[in-house]
């Protein structure tokens, strides 16, 4: 990713956590090297300039979007990791501690995700095909 608007937009819309985190990390690297460059010796500024040349320029608003997208993607996958932890013998209290929430909140989060998975999929191919089969009969 070279930092142009199209590649940043593509990363943010990709659903690929690694691409999204790269946008976030590039912003933070750029900020860090700019701070170093502003306060260092000539040698430090030269080193910072070298590193800045290799980091994609990411706007603060793009970084905020990347942050929000990363949180969304990670939270969406949390239920699966909770399932793995439970299967490995973790208690709800341990899971809650790992997440920084209560055991009840961890249990409630997992329950809500399971309920979402049980909802009918509006793009259920089998249901769509069943309608075609019904049409053949009529």
Each language-model region and where it sits:
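General nucleic-acid-binding
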Residues: 1-54
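Generic alpha-helix initiation/capping and coil-helix boundary signal
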Residues: 41, 53-56, 78, 98-99, ...
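Short alpha-helical "packing" element that flanks the helix-turn-helix/winged-helix DNA-binding module
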Residues: 81-82
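Short, Lys/Arg-rich amphipathic alpha-helical interaction segments
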Residues: 91-138
């Amino acid at each position: 990713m070279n930092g142009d608007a199209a590649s940043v937009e593509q990363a943010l819309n990709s659903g690929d956590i690694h691409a999204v985190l790269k946008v976030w990390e590039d912003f933070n690297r750029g900020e860090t090297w700019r701070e170093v460059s502003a306060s260092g010796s000539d040698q430090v500024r030269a080193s910072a300039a070298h590193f800045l040349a290799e980091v994609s320029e990411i706007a603060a608003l793009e970084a905020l979007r990347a942050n929000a997208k990363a949180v969304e993607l990670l939270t969406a996958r949390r239920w699966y990791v909770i399932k793995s932890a439970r299967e490995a013998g973790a208690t709800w209290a341990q899971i809650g501690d790992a997440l920084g929430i209560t055991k009840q909140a961890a249990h409630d989060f997992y329950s809500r995700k399971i309920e979402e998975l049980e909802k009918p999929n509006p793009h259920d191919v089998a249901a769509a095909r069943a309608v075609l089969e019904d049409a053949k009969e009529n």
